[in-house]
Amino acid sequence: MWRSARRTPLYYPDAVTLLADAVPSDVLAGIDTSPGCSIKDSFAAQDFTSHGFAELFTAHWIYRLPEARPASGLRAEEVGTAAGLRAWQSAWHGGDDAPDVFRPALLDEPDVVVLALRSGEELAGGVVLNRGSGVVGLSNLFAVDGEETAVWSAAVAAAAARWPELPLAGYEHGDDLEHALACGFVALGPLRVWMRR
């Protein structure tokens, strides 16, 4: 079990189950369960409705072996400045008033890369890649103006260029899951995110 005794930033869970047999009362112990609290059940195995939580979404863990990378017409450009990160975050959020969840200190982390994916000079999308123990995490992928297929391909190609020996992992749902599967990922199993209303 991972948990934070203090409320986490927006979009980050207050607790994460690390074992399928976690018990809801154990998950809730030691966290602020007031409205806004969120829990990521990594196995979609628990039901928190009797504790005042509602399901926010169900997604699937995705995984891709480090095999042939897809061709992409997009150029991957590493975001390296605070101003560049603010512009990336605004595009990720879909416009103005983006929450400040990507801090400039992130750019100094050696195992984290924030990428702007460009068609010429135009931003087509972006992704965050983070290297962990034997795997590269892929998160916060977004596409601008219906470029999903090209953005997924570019994200996979960029990860393979940087860390060619490592597989990719993440989680997605809805149309994003379909794009991931079309790009060579496989769905491993469900996860569920709960929110206290």
Residue ranges with predicted function:
Residues 164:
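C-terminal active-site rim and adjoining tail of enzyme catalytic domains
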Residues 81-91:
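A short, well-structured alpha-helix characteristic of acyl/acetyltransferase catalytic modules
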Residues 146-158:
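Conserved acetyl-CoA pyrophosphate-binding loop and the N-cap/start of the following alpha-helix
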Residues 18-83, 155-159, 168-197:
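Acyl-donor-binding surface of acyltransferase catalytic domains
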Residues 16-22, 140-148:
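A short, internal acetyl-CoA/4′-phosphopantetheine-binding micro-motif in the GNAT/acyltransferase core
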Residues 97-143, 189:
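A conserved beta-strand-loop-helix scaffold within acyl/acetyltransferase catalytic domains
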Residues 13-14, 74, 92, 128-129:
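Amphipathic alpha-helical "stalk" segments
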Residues 1-36, 42-45, 94-111:
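N-terminal charged segments
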